[in-house]
């Protein structure tokens, strides 16, 4: 069923939702899929609309739906408060005083936290992202390739200036 968790990363409370299938057995390691929402979304909304909690239920997968940070950004000369993943340096023009959050650190912390609560299959940790979440997933394919087996991105991309030097080569 649905679980809401929070963790503290660099002094900020960060939120994520986890669907634990009814068939979960703590004696059997369970595969993990991160689902990263797009711009203006959040973990709860993606939990409700992505269809992955249902897939996780039928396929016995622990599905994770983290929420990105709400930033003040300047886009096309307009200031707006909107959720975005900090997918690569220089991706957005932040308002004065806004501090980009370390989302890779956040996603790693989720794995650590959940590893203390559940029996995770460390060889089957995957990440799926849509739009800005897809951009974040591609960043993680480089910076988290030591803990992620594969990444799927939809409607996202690598930054043009991304240095692709992954810790391990994984399918993207």
Where are these predicted regions, by residue range?
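A domain-start/cap signature at the N-terminus of enzymes
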Residues: 1-32, 44-45, 50, 55-58, ...
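Structural cue for short, hydrophobic secondary-structure segments
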Residues: 35-38, 65
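Serine-hydrolase catalytic-loop signature spanning alpha/beta hydrolases and amidase-signature enzymes
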Residues: 40-42
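A fold-wide structural signal in alpha/beta-hydrolase
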Residues: 60-67
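Cap/lid segment of the alpha/beta-hydrolase catalytic domain
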Residues: 67-102
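A short beta-to-alpha transition loop/helix N-cap that caps and shapes the active-site region
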Residues: 71-75, 158-164
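Alpha/beta-hydrolase active-site loop
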Residues: 89-119, 139
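Catalytic His-Asp charge-relay segment
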Residues: 169-172
